[in-house]
């Protein structure tokens, strides 16, 4: 192996593929667990990921490359105008709680306060439309976005009804195409579960 490296021989490729999914479970009640789950993921995962990728384009435009699968249900949550409006209130509630901590806990909260404020500023800069930032990264060539089964259904269990499997995949492809104006380059199989003859 060392000889191969010193002779500059091509050894292969490494692909980093992230999988992003949340179920589309909505409740009308205020402060529902499902909304909290989505907002926390936006705060701690999706905004930071988009920001790091945007920064990588500035620093090394030719070297930045990543693949992510965005499930149709997660995309639908990103597209929800109601959730886009609720996120600032959700994060401001947490900021107020951090500001009310006793003095001896203040040092620990400063990092969280700054992080939450930064993420909220980013959210507001783009009017809560994080999905458009993913589109920007896709169009820039630094990010490949693939799809997943429409409802993240476990396909090996669904194979008894082939129409269901086909429906899951075709619906996901249509949803991806209508969102990003391109067909997905691939699909992430839910739970990485494959069965023989799954190829469609």
Feature roles, as predicted:
Residues 1-200:
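Carbohydrate-active enzymes and regulators
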């Amino acid at each position: 192996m060392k000889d191969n490296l010193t002779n500059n021989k091509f050894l292969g490729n490494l692909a980093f593929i992230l999988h992003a999914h949340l179920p589309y479970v909505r409740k009308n009640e205020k402060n529902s667990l499902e909304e909290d789950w989505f907002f926390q993921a936006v705060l701690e995962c999706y905004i930071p990921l988009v920001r790091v990728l945007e920064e990588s384009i500035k620093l090394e435009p030719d070297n930045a490359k990543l693949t992510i699968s965005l499930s149709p249900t997660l995309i639908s949550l990103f597209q929800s105008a109601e959730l886009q409006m609720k996120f600032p209130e959700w994060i401001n509630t947490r900021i107020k709680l951090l500001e009310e901590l006793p003095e001896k806990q203040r040092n620990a909260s400063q990092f969280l306060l700054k992080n939450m404020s930064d993420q909220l500023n980013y959210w507001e800069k783009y009017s809560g439309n994080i999905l458009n930032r993913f589109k920007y990264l896709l169009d820039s060539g630094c990010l490949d976005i693939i799809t997943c089964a429409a409802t993240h259904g476990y396909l090996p269990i669904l194979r008894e009804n082939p129409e269901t499997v086909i429906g899951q995949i075709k619906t996901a492809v249509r949803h991806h195409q209508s969102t990003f104006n391109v067909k997905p380059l691939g699909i992430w199989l839910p739970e990485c579960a494959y069965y023989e003859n799954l190829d469609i």
